[in-house]
Amino acid sequence: MKDLVKFLKAQSKTSEDFDVIKIGLASPDMIRSWSYGEVKKPETINYRTFKPERDGLFCARIFGPVKDYECLCGKYKRLKHRGVICEKCGVEVTQAKVRRERMGHIELASPVAHIWFLKSLPSRIGLLLDMPLRDIERVLYFESYIVIEPGMTDLERGQLLTEEQFLDAEDRWQDEFDAKMGAEAIQALLRDMDLEVECETLREELQSTNSETKRKKITKRLKLLESFIQSGNKPEWMVMTVLPVLPPDLRPLVPLDGGRFATSDLNDLYRRVINRNNRLKRLLDLIAPDIIVRNEKRMLQESVDALLDNGRRGRAITGSNRRPLKSLADMIKGKQGRFRQNLLGKRVDYSGRSVITVGPYLHLHQCGLPKKMALELFRPFIYAKLESRGFATTIKAAKKMVEREDAIVWDILADVIREHPILLNRAPTLHRLGIQAFEPILIEGKAIQLHPLVCAAFNADFDGDQMAVHVPLTLEAQLEARALMMSTNNILSPANGEPIIVPSQDVVLGLYYMTRDKVNGKGEGMLLQDSREAEKAYRTGQAELHSRVKVRITEYVKNAIGEFEPQTHLVDTTIGRAILWMIAPKGMPFSLFNQTLGKKAISKLINESYRRLGLKESVLFADHIMYTGFAYAARSGSSVGIDDMVIPQKKYEIISAAEEEVAEIQEQFQSGLVTAGERYNKVIDIWAAANERVAKAMMENLSQEEVINREGQPEKQASFNSIFMMADSGARGSAAQIRQLAGMRGLMARPDGSIIETPITANFREGLNVLQYFISTHGARKGLADTALKTANSGYLTRRLVDVAQDLVIIEDDCGTHEGIVMTPLIEGGDVKEALRDRVLGRVAAEDILKPGTNEVLISRNTLLDEKLCDVIDENSVDSIKVRSVVTCDTDFGVCAKCYGRDLARGHLINQGEAVGVIAAQSIGEPGTQLTMRTFHIGGAASAAAKESSVQVKNTGTLRLTNVKFVTNKEGKLVLTSRNTELTIIDTFGRTKEHYKVPYGAVLNHADGEEVTAGETVANWDPHTMPVISEVSGFVKFVEIVDGLTVTRQTDELTGLSSIVVQDVGERATAGKDLRPALKLVDAQGNDIFIPGTDVMAQYFLPGKAIVTLDDGAEVFVGEPLARIPQESVGTKDITGGLPRVADLFEARKPKEPAILAEISGIVSFGKETKGKRRLLITPMEGETYEEMIPKWRQLNVFEGELVQRGDLISDGAETPHDILRLRGVHAVTDYIVNEVQEVYRLQGVKINDKHIEVIVRQMLRKAIITNAYDSEFLEGEQVEVARVKIVNRKRAEEGKPLVEFERELLGITKASLATESFISAASFQETTRVLTEAAVAGKRDELRGLKENVIVGRLIPAGTGFAYHQNRQKNRLVGGMENTTEVKLSAVDEEEIASEFTFSAEDATANLAEMLNMADDAE
């Protein structure tokens, strides 16, 4: 028996015996060494006997026997002849599965170039030979000769010759030179290359050249040559002389019924190669004419190309049914390829799926499993139990019992299932909460029952969703399922640390109804001794649920030693709240319950319970909340009737007022006072505002009702209208939806996103007329179409994010860095978008936090900021904190726990081995998919907020202006002439309360440093146009303003007023292209006026579309507008813009018209202009002037003589993250990406913690470009992992050498994934062919560091519970080298080894073996 086990062990080589996977080029000898024989014939199997043909593609002599331990002719059968080679048919007697691993080979009659190294760009062969691909192809496909050895002639090595030139040369020099065609020629050239010498010459060239393109080209070649030298690959191996043949069971021939066969495409492709190869051999033996041989060689080359990568060159070879054959390359790439279909995603045994239904009576850790499913899933366990308890003598008998479904089987099943967790999964699994463990409860019926509270995590509903069940088999798997994946351990969301086990819909409505109060309810003013009595009063009908009463409440408060002490008070509350208090756990304050509970408040309840009382109490509490909510929702009897949609009386007045305003604007437009664009914008604004007013009137109407109180006086109270209650509680629906039911539907968007200017004034209760209905359908259908498209987009974004971040794992506790990022509260306008406490909660302080204005340390560095410490920060009004961040973490190939901070899903400092990269990717990707599915909920109703046109402050304080330049107009008001002015309001403690951006041309009512009071308007401007402000007083003089060339004149028919509109450069006649229309200010004598304090003329260049209403020579005063430029109209805000925006940010794409930033600090001036561009010069205090050409149509934010700082805006536009990184550094680019991504999600009301985005940014900043390599192993301009450079620099610092200088580089997530050090991970992501080609040429090693690589080779991942396993492996490797560890393993193969995996006695084993053999005989 022991021998058998040892034999089986030896058979299966474990995945333990390698640590690195190396990929390289195979030499012909290597291919021959893999092979078990040469395949000489294209035949597959004999059509009569169905036995494989000898020497054919399925030959048993080469590849092994077709049946286990049986040779082909049948002379040797059974196990006893193991290892014998039959002398008759030459087949070795062994297991048939060797046909899956034994390879053959084909000796090619003429060499063939490998298409991957030829055609995969950049062509490696072309790069090595320094020849264009086109030329190499001409040689390979026998169109031209190439000179291999010029000898004493005036030809050059590598020169191409046509047929005529070759014949001429032969006449002239006879045998002096050598020129060939075909792969032999290329192989000879590659073989003759001296890599070392070539490298030397290239290095010298690199030193001597100045041209940038040349440098790049040389560096590319140099890298390729060096990689060949280092990897030990020989260039000539890129041309094959021997072709390996895949084992036959990996390209099977399957008999179908009716005597036909289904075959793998590879067999066809191999057959082609063998046929052509044999024909070529014959032709060579016959010494056939050159032209025939050549043609045959070309065909051989083409057939090998098709086998390796069909369709890469020329037309794809197709099979009988006109579809291209699937080549070897197609087998591994794409979604259906080997990597993604079979290695990263496998089908799993012991699993089933079924429809889900509600299980409202379940506990949180339970799910209902249909008996039928359980019986099937736990089959082997049942067999074992039946046998061990003596109900069945053999497995066969047990099987029969289970099939008969004997009564005893059900008892055993219940026993087996007890405390055996199962996993439930709902596709799509967008985050880790999409798979959770539950304890199964056996139920009748065929649907899985799911606990309602976990639906949010699974994003499940019961409209026909299905879920899959998986059974964890081993003890370890069960342990992990119970300890880590149980639904009760996943109360908080990993994305934002808030509870995800939150009641919704019915439960919320029930609790809301139960905790509402009512004026003059039955039994108001009763005095009750406790919650019990309150319930009694309600049940007996003495009091209503909502009546206001006084109740004695006993709270439990923790004392100094952490024990609960009871405290009793008399509290004003309602009957319902008192009843709800009965389920509150000890230690919760009653104040949290003594309010009307909406969805937010309930979420807060659960959160508080978790933070105060821990996991167990919170789970029980959540369950009780759910049961109570369901019960009282049923009691409330809420339902919706058409009468609940109350239309406000004011609606009709508001609409007619709006219609009058629109008519007025229309009149202004017709009299030429406003342009078409301005009119459109203003109309949209009027309707948007009217819609808001109607909605407000409607909500006021719905949300309140007037009742008579006990004193007989009228009093307002919140309404008990069902629709209002549903929306107000957060159970279903929103104000926006009610607005469409009972207000007005409002503005609609066209499918392209532009807004239709006639709104739908009706609502759904009144009903829509045909036109309105038609307009409505636009939005609704667009929503549905978008959803389908965007789901795919979002899934792809998630995939890219996971791929870029998958190898980021917490690998140490503290990296010891003092770096970090500075956090301040996010203030936009008068609102604090995110308070400082919310941003730093769960982070680790990077520096001591001081009390403002003193040196007293509030919190010392390296402290995890939890809720209590955040309260301290709030109380002391700290306004900026430097916290540790993943982006600044110093750990190589991972992150440290301190830089990451709190594990959001658990609430304590994160553990080592946590896969933070994947969690971050899921947290960002998951809402993307959710949001994509939510566009059509508001039915395309345009929510264009009326554009802001003033700043009205909300707090009293001091006004502060930054980046400000202004002129004072004749009324004494300040007019801004600076572009990015920021206006902040500071309170008496020096805290920023409000923050606004104020545009150019705004009129300010207060100067810097003045006191302002709340509600005051401090600035106004026209939101639809941008003025050009005069900075001096004088007379206007037109410059290059020529009618019909640079401008068009528009005269209004009604008023006779004329205005001048500047044409865009692109629309002008050729003569006007170089003209630059401008307004110049001159004094009364016609002399130029200079802007005060500078030597710059007061001349204003007018961009396209600018409108001038002044006449030539008109007088203007300082601060007055000279011209106005209409601004673009608004589109609808919708995540459609959101999802692509997030993708653009993570891909670090350059925007269409990027902002231009100042490269250095200095004084701006303009140099000589070229045709379409102007020359911007920046002169620093010292050093050389920087110059940049800027297209003339770009609007500049700077004037001549202005001082700019490095990184300042010169021309408006979207900023490019690459520029921000280059000019402002890592912190600025992190801030930019984090804030921009958060902006998109915030718009949708999705909370994601900043650190997830930072994790992705860290991965985008993984690479550096070497700027000065000194004498290190790097090349200048090479792209290297930052961690590698840091390691080298540490070593150099110890040796006292100068440190390698580098610049961080920002890569988009796709690029970053493909640039990862692991080629296995990159190949399984995208562009498999390119990645593998590159890796093979460079002889890359994969250290199996990330998660994907380990999944692919079938190991535990180096994260979570697999983290320790990998650490041990590394220790073993360091201690004894790999050899020892394998020996240790083998010496341990004894009793104890077996015992650890499964226990059985020898008798049992033999009995079972005998039974199996019998069964096999029966089968025969």
Swiss-Prot record:
What is the protein's known function? Answer: DNA-dependent RNA polymerase catalyzes the transcription of DNA into RNA using the four ribonucleoside triphosphates as substrates.
Entries under PANTHER family matching the protein = DNA-DIRECTED RNA POLYMERASE, DNA-DIRECTED RNA POLYMERASE SUBUNIT BETA
Which residues are Zn(2+) 1-binding?
71, 73, 86, 89
Q: Does the keyword Nucleus apply?
A: no
Catalytic activities: RNA(n) + a ribonucleoside 5'-triphosphate = RNA(n+1) + diphosphate
Q: Which SUPFAM superfamilies match?
A: beta and beta-prime subunits of DNA dependent RNA-polymerase
According to the record's subunit comment, the protein's assembly and interactions are: The RNAP catalytic core consists of 2 alpha, 1 beta, 1 beta' and 1 omega subunit. When a sigma factor is associated with the core the holoenzyme is formed, which can initiate transcription.
Q: Which family does it belong to?
A: Belongs to the RNA polymerase beta' chain family.
How is this protein named in the record? DNA-directed RNA polymerase subunit beta'
